[in-house]
């Protein structure tokens, strides 16, 4: 089986259908994907089934699931896609896993998600600029790292503490801050300018 797709790019409109293992969208051009259509085809129609997908759209959130050949996302509204979920249906889902990863503004390529998992970001307002989608035989290894396939922005109050944390240095790889207005403790790992929240 092979997945083909079309992307609707900000400022460019619909691109020609192509094999999604290569790339849907663009990198290095700061152009967001606003909508996608996906299809799954099998050589000689040896499998039945199809593909379902769901887009997380700027200022909208998660749309409903749609399927083979239909549009996920929006056109004519200047709203970019921020995340995707993709899954196989029918017989093809018994023999293959679908892996996909997003190239997101300010983050670049994220890790691989599979079979309906979230891929992309939420809460940052960052656009998906490109995506790769691959089919692999069921229960075989991912095409690459699956770490950080989806990044959800921390709540504002945690984010404020993160910003404050990055003003401080520590003689250890850890930093502890106390938010006196909320009476919460934040624990960070890393170094000055690159503290990552591990507990709040």
What spans do the regions from the language model cover?
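Cell wall/extracellular polymer interaction/catalysis modules
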Residues: 156-200
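Lectin-type carbohydrate-recognition ectodomains
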Residues: 1-156
